[in-house]
Amino acid sequence: MAKKSLRVKQARPQKFKVRAYNRCLRCGRPHGYMRKFGLCRICFRELAYKGELPGIVKASW
């Protein structure tokens, strides 16, 4: 419940620009956020593993 209220709170326009922060679009996690994809590291890893993110491949060298 707390996470849902924080997602709603974050979505509202902030009175001050400094208060704005990014949240994962999928799960709402505020930390480990990747701007390029709009996802947290955990959701990014899950989707990349399933092959649902185009152009993302596992590194091998």
UniProtKB/Swiss-Prot annotation:
One of its GO terms (biological process) is translation. Coiled coil: none annotated. One of its GO terms (cellular component) is small ribosomal subunit. PROSITE patterns: RIBOSOMAL_S14. Its cofactor is Zn(2+). GO terms for molecular function: rRNA binding; structural constituent of ribosome; zinc ion binding. Keywords: Metal-binding, Ribonucleoprotein, Ribosomal protein, RNA-binding, rRNA-binding, Zinc. It holds the Pfam family Ribosomal_S14. Binds 1 zinc ion per subunit. It comes from the Bacteria. Zn(2+) binds at residues 24, 27, 40, 43. Belongs to the universal ribosomal protein uS14 family. Zinc-binding uS14 subfamily. NCBIfam families: PRK08061.1. Part of the 30S ribosomal subunit. Contacts proteins S3 and S10. Binds 16S rRNA, required for the assembly of 30S particles and may also be responsible for determining the conformation of the 16S rRNA at the A site. This is Small ribosomal subunit protein uS14. It comes from Moorella thermoacetica (strain ATCC 39073 / JCM 9320).
